[in-house]
Amino acid sequence: MPEEYLNAQKMEKLERIKSRGINPYPATFHPSHTSVQAVALLAELEKQENPPKEILRIAGRIMTLRDMGKISFMDIRDGSGKIQVFCRQNDLDEASIELLKDLDLGDFIGAEGSLMRTRTGEPSLAATKISLLSKSLLPLPEKWHGLQDVEKRYRQRYLDLISNADARQTFLTRSQVISAIRSFMSSKGFLEVETPVLQPEAGGALARPFITHHQALDCDFYMRIALELHLKRLIVGGFDRVYEIGRIFRNEGVSTRHNPEFTMMESYQAYADYKDVMDFLEEMVSSVVKEISGGYTVPFGDTTLDFTPPWPRLSMRDAVKQYAGIDFFDFPTKEALAAEMIRRKLKVDPAKDWGKLVDELVGEFVEPRLIQPTFLTDHPVAMSPLAKQKPEDPRLTERFEAICANMEIANAFSELNDPVEQRARFKEQLEKRNQLRTEESESIDEDFLAALAYGMPPTGGLGVGIDRLVMLLTNHDSIREVILFPALKDREDKGEQE
């Protein structure tokens, strides 16, 4: 950041502070209490007839500053909340009195003193000493309106978090959701593991990968597009229940529901099928919702989402019949289904295969009808190269997606563990993908097929979109609101402060 963007008045104050021999950026300060702890302690002391006069040390950022001559009031905020600091010149040492003159909104201070309640009933710390912990050199966003520019909120998330209590609460909730999922998975006997982000093959999903080059090894790697294939290797290796919460990278479109890097939780359970996983997901999500919100219902936009189990279950074929009026098995080829869609005046991308066209029908007609949590089950084989076929109808797979508020929040299979069938499906999938692309062709993950050939037990696999789940629990309709630093197009004026 060029120095000319720094606030001149704040720079003058900084120099005055330095001239008095004060380090404006000391290495440490040890608070005795957080602001919330201090307020709670005051309430406890007020219950006692003769409470002891305790000396506390608190620290935080100055959010409001009111100078009334010989008395000043400051609201300071730390990670737990805020508390008022009451400064009376008669109670302060000379250095603190001088320092007060050069403090601004945004500065971090440490305050030492005793607890009190003002005449208006405000819990406060009556300060006897003030220490500067960090001098702010740029003005904070205007107090009453906060940070209004949406892109600036995403680009400079630190300002958003300073200004907007709702933003801070969103990311506190996100952390609580992930902690609740980890606790639930542990209670069910799942082992949390870590698998490679850099991979020699881009497998486990139909998505375009990011590619990077490893200088020392002199070879290209892909940023992972799924957690799946390495987790299945661990099932082969003898772990019965494994899961990972990790970042996924897909070099595809950006929207209110898609970010190039996002967080997934994937789990794999030996000796389970997709119906077992359906029950498992239902229990997990409903328990997380209850832990976070206190009940099974949460507001979302103009509606209320109800996660009370059991959730409705609807086959994909029946759903497309019901909402689009098309039985996709009546049109078994790409050409036939495309012709029917064109006849109904629907847009058709000629590059998409039959499975992708079915997916288009689901996105166009089915997902917009599914507001409450619903399981969409039994996808066609063409859409599910890693899932087992249904014995009673081999055109379909043992798969489900959990849909809520018109978007997919989870996806699960009875995992395909026949290495011969898996190779055949990989080949078919690869041929389709390479026909559609002009860049370097992809290849089959031979090591994964080798792992399957050693034997993998019947396994139920699950993937949960953490970002979308957090969207639902924080009442946000954009994924950028729940990712601390979402992907944004580079701006031409980078480095400038508005």
From Swiss-Prot:
PROSITE patterns, alphabetized: AA_TRNA_LIGASE_II
Keywords noted in UniProt: Aminoacyl-tRNA synthetase, ATP-binding, Cytoplasm, Ligase, Magnesium, Metal-binding, Nucleotide-binding, Protein biosynthesis
Necessary cofactors: Mg(2+)
Cofactor note: Binds 3 Mg(2+) ions per subunit.
GO biological process, alphabetically ordered: lysyl-tRNA aminoacylation
Compartments, record wording: Cytoplasm
Enzyme Commission number(s) of this protein: 6.1.1.6
Reactions catalysed according to its record: tRNA(Lys) + L-lysine + ATP = L-lysyl-tRNA(Lys) + AMP + diphosphate
InterPro entries named among the record's database cross-references: Aa-tRNA-synt_II, aa-tRNA-synth_II, aa-tRNA-synth_II/BPL/LPL, Lys-tRNA-ligase_II, Lys-tRNA-ligase_II_N, Lys-tRNA-synth_II_C, NA-bd_OB-fold, NA-bd_OB_tRNA
Annotated transmembrane regions: none
CDD domains: LysRS_core, LysRS_N
Positions of Mg(2+) 2 binding: 408
Record: residues binding Mg(2+) 1: 401, 408
Origin superkingdom: Bacteria
Gene Ontology molecular function: ATP binding; lysine-tRNA ligase activity; magnesium ion binding; tRNA binding
A cellular component annotation (GO) from this entry: cytosol
Subunit structure comment from the entry: Homodimer.
Annotated family: Belongs to the class-II aminoacyl-tRNA synthetase family.
Name of the protein: Lysine--tRNA ligase
Source organism of the structure: Dehalococcoides mccartyi (strain ATCC BAA-2266 / KCTC 15142 / 195) (Dehalococcoides ethenogenes (strain 195))
